[in-house]
Amino acid sequence: MQQAAGVSAADAATLLVPAVGMLPSNHPVSLRTVEVVRAQLEKDGLLYRYLTDDGIEGGEGAFLICSFWLLDCLTHAGRLEEADELLDKLLLLGNDVGLFAEQADVVTGEALGNFPQAFSHMALVLSCAYLSAAKNGEIAFDGAADYAELAVDRLLAGRPF
C-alpha cells in the first residue's frame, strides 16, 4: 500500500488496511506494507505518520497512535513476540501517572503535541486488549477481520477483553 496513487512514499495510515477488514494482517500485501512503513517511517518503535512534504512548515514528532497501529498489525499477524517488545517501548512513553501525548520525539521520547491525547489512550487500550486476546488464542490469524467488529462481538458475547 502507498500513500496515494502515483506516490511511492510510505504512510502509516496504510497500516489500517487490515484493521478495517480490507485484507488479512498476514496477507502478503499487508506484510509488505508493514515492512515498508517500518523501513521508511520507524525510529526505534516510533512511527512518523509520513515524511512527504505536505506544505505545512515545521516538523512533527512520531505519532503514538501510528505506533499502536503497528502493534495491532503485528498482533493480528501472529507476531506476538515483536508486538510485546514494541508495547514495552511504547509504555515507557507515558508520564509518571500513565498519561500519553499525541506525539513523541524519536530521540528523547519527550512528549509532543496535544497532551494528554485521547486517541493515544484509546489505541493503547485496544492494542493491549488485542494482544491479550491473541496470547489467549482468541484471535484467528487467518482471514480478514475488522478489528472493531472483533471487539464488539466479544462484548456482545459477554467476553470483554
Question: Which residue ranges define each predicted feature?
Answer:
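Extended glycan-interaction surfaces of carbohydrate-active proteins
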Residues: 1-63, 85-116, 122-136, 140-161
